[in-house]
Curated annotation (Swiss-Prot):
Region spans: LID: 126-142
UniProt family annotation: Belongs to the adenylate kinase family.
Protein name in the entry: Adenylate kinase
Record-level Gene Ontology MF annotations: adenylate kinase activity; ATP binding
Organism ancestry: Bacteria, Pseudomonadati, Pseudomonadota, Alphaproteobacteria, Hyphomicrobiales
C-alpha cells in the first residue's frame, strides 16, 4: 500500500501516518526525517544536502526526489509506505509518478486532510504548550510568525496538488476537524 498524505501544517498528517504505520506495518516516510538520515550517514546525496542547508538555501527537488527514490528502494518499503511532506509541489508529484513507474509501482491513495486556518493555529499553540509541559523541545517553526509563513507556502506551493491528484482520480478528501479516531476510520475505509 503506497499512500500520500496531504494537508496544511498542523492538519494531523503525522498523527495519521503513525496510526496507519501501526495498522498496516509499513513505514512512515517523512522528508525531514529522510534528509536528516542521509546527512547523518554522510551519503553522497547527504553531503550535498548538508552543504545546501548550511548555506541557508532550500534543498532542490532533484536532491529530495533522489532521497525519496533511494528510500523507497529499501527493504521495509516492499509492502508500501506512507509519504508525509512529499510531494510538496506539482513538480515533485510528477517526479514521484516517474520514480514509481520506473520501479513498476503506483500510488494506491492520496489523502488530503482539510482543516480551517483558525483550528490549525490553535493546534500549533496547543502542541507548543503540550511539548513545554512535557519538558520537550519545541519545533523552531512552531511560533506564530513561522507558522503563518508555512501556511502561506502551503497555499501557494502545495495546495495545487489537490487539483493534480483530483484530475487523476486519486484524491480522497477528509474533514480533518473531526476526531483523530474518526479520521483514521475513514482513511482505513478508503484503503480497504
Amino acid at each position: 500500500m503506497r499512500v500520500v498524505l496531504l494537508g496544511p501544517p498542523g492538519a494531523g498528517k503525522g498523527t495519521q501516518a503513525k496510526m496507519l504505520t501501526e495498522e498496516y506495518n509499513i513505514p512512515h516516510l517523512s522528508t525531514g526525517d529522510m534528509l536528516r538520515e542521509v546527512i547523518a550517514k554522510e551519503t553522497e546525496v547527504g553531503k550535498k544536502a548538508k552543504a545546501i542547508i548550511s548555506s541557508g538555501a532550500l534543498v532542490p527537488d532533484s536532491i529530495v526526489n533522489q532521497i525519496v527514490s533511494d528510500r523507497i528502494d529499501e527493504a521495509d518499503c516492499i509492502n508500501g509506505f506512507i509519504l508525509d511532506g512529499y510531494p510538496r509541489t506539482v513538480g515533485q508529484a510528477e517526479a514521484l509518478q516517474q520514480i514509481l513507474e520506473s520501479k513498476n509501482m503506483r500510488l494506491d491513495a492520496v489523502i488530503e486532510l482539510c482543516v480551517n486556518e483558525d483550528a490549525l493555529i490553535e493546534r500549533m499553540e496547543r502542541r507548543v504548550q503540550e511539548t513545554v509541559a512535557a519538558g520537550g523541545q519545541v519545533r523552531l517553526d512552531d511560533n506564530p510568525v513561522a507558522f503563518a509563513k508555512r501556511l502561506v507556502e502551503y497555499r501557494e506551493k502545495t495546495s495545487p496538488l489537490s487539483k493534480f491528484y483530483s484530475e487523476r482520480g486519486m484524491l480522497k478528501v477528509i474533514d480533518g476537524m473531526i476526531g483523530i479516531a474518526e479520521v483514521t476510520r475513514i482513511i482505513k475505509g478508503f484503503l480497504s
